[in-house]
UniProtKB/Swiss-Prot annotation:
PROSITE patterns: AA_TRNA_LIGASE_II (PS50862). This is Proline--tRNA ligase. The gene is proS. It comes from Pelagibacter ubique (strain HTCC1062). It is found in: Cytoplasm. GO terms for cellular component: cytosol.
């Protein structure tokens, strides 16, 4: 792929309307374009990053046995009236009518729809548990959309739902998603803290939100610093191991402002371990028992001829928001270097030849290298623009391509100038470079 053939509308400067660095960078390097307030078109660069994030989310959901479905964005109002949330949801819900005058809505969430799907098909406890998820666009009519895709009205989200026969099994399902989210964010190189949270309009009595630290975050958080030393290593998918993992995190104080209790914070956390800062919510999980199954009559047959309403949970990750969250965590605004995790970078390698109309040897060499790396499944782009090498390197630092090969006029035959973003270049052989890149792919 030549950059001259790519649709990457880069701006020279940060747009004045953007207030936080993720919004600034995404507009500047042509990842998104605003369509209307809080609604964006995703251009090739941004869409590519988002799809890579989506795939990591999908893989981690599949690993815990969740099954992917796809529900529509437009939902009938009937099931929302049946659950009692049609009027309760307020002005955030976009209500519409079709040509027959039927009341419809643009889905802000999917508890009602997935419960309707479940109740039409599953009748016996023998079919449980069921873990279903989808990745789809949502719309919530925010009063004041801001910060680009971080607080937009339309957003891309992974929603999962669990259906179990009793509270014990439902807790097991909840803990599976708790574990899955920790693994997902680790693969995205984000330090996400699971925090006790209010259930809000979703309902229920158990909830955690996953927060990453960021100065631009809208959530004020209060936590014990020692929570950052924890991880999910050694955890396996059995009841005790997953319960132990959750308890390990819950032993440390970590809450957002709506759950904050000053006396409890000071009692449980020593002064040297107290951290009060801001963060961005990137995931939220809920257990709400039979709130929706009872309202929508989603019951299964039990042994002995009895029936009972299934126990449910819901589990969300903001896929589009994660694009902005990674930028907030990884973008060095001072030096204009974006350090995407290798697994989600828009390109994995940039080949940067010096362009000379009278000497095509550097471009010819770039083309040969492109074919080599293409055969190794390395996502590569060639900068064939007539610009100086310094400008090209700055451009790829801003876009966030993690590795670069620079072909200047003094390039040696057997050695290549190889540069990791933000570091000094090295002279390496093609085999050495190939090994570095293939090892990076294997890590992810």
């Amino acid at each position: 792929m030549y950059i001259s053939k790519s649709f990457i509308p880069i701006l020279k400067n940060n747009p004045s309307e953007a207030k936080i660095k993720s919004h600034q960078l995404m507009l500047r390097v042509g990842m998104i374009k605003q369509s209307s307030a809080g609604i964006y078109s995703w251009l090739p660069l941004g869409f590519k990053v988002m799809k890579k994030i989506e795939q990591i989310v999908r893989e981690e959901q599949n690993k815990i046995g969740a099954q992917e479905i796809l529900m529509p964005t437009i939902q009938p109002s009937d099931i929302w009236k049946e659950s009692g949330r049609y009027d309760d949801y307020g002005d955030e819900m976009l209500r519409i009518k079709d040509r027959q005058g039927r009341e419809m809505l643009y889905g802000p969430t999917n508890e009602e729809l997935v419960t309707d799907i479940f109740r039409s098909s599953v009748k016996s406890y023998k079919s449980l548990p069921q873990l279903l998820y989808h990745i789809q666009w949502k719309f919530r009519d925010e009063v004041r959309p801001r910060f680009g895709i971080m607080r937009g009205r339309e957003f891309y989200m992974k929603d999962a739902y669990s259906f179990d026969v009793n509270d014990e099994d439902a807790t097991f399902s909840y803990n599976k998603f708790f574990f899955s989210y920790l693994k997902t964010f680790k693969r995205l190189e984000l330090s996400a803290i699971p925090m006790a949270a209010d259930t809000g309009p979703i309902g229920g009595n158990l909830s955690h939100e996953f927060i990453i630290l960021a100065d631009t975050g809208e959530s004020k958080i209060f936590t014990d610093k020692r929570v950052f030393d924890l991880g999910s290593e050694g955890t396996v998918l059995d009841r005790q191991s997953l319960q132990d993992l959750r308890k390990k995190y819950e032993q440390y104080y970590a809450v957002a402002d709506e759950k904050f209790n000053k006396n409890e914070f000071e009692e449980k956390v020593s002064e040297e371990n107290r951290l009060i800062t801001k963060g961005i919510e990137v995931g939220h999980i809920f257990y709400f028992g039979d709130k929706y199954s009872k309202a929508l009559n989603a019951a299964v047959d039990l042994p002995g001829g009895k029936k009972d309403f299934v126990k449910m949970g819901s589990y969300g990750i903001g896929v589009s928001r994660l694009v902005g969250a990674i930028i907030e965590a990884k973008y060095d605004q001072k030096d204009e270097i974006m350090k995407w995790p290798f697994s989600v970078a828009p390109y994995e390698l940039a080949i940067i030849p010096m362009i000379n109309k009278n000497d095509t040897s550097a471009l010819d060499k770039a083309n040969k290298l492109f074919k080599h790396f293409e055969s190794k499944n390395i996502d590569t782009i060639i900068d064939d623009m007539d610009e100086n090498l310094s400008s090209k390197i700055k451009k790829f630092n801003l876009i966030g391509v993690p590795y670069q090969i620079i072909l200047g006029k003094n390039s040696e035959d057997n050695l290549l100038e190889f540069k990791e973003i933000g570091k000094d270049p090295k002279s390496l052989t093609l085999d050495q470079i190939t090994q570095i890149l293939t090892e990076q792919k294997l890590k992810n």
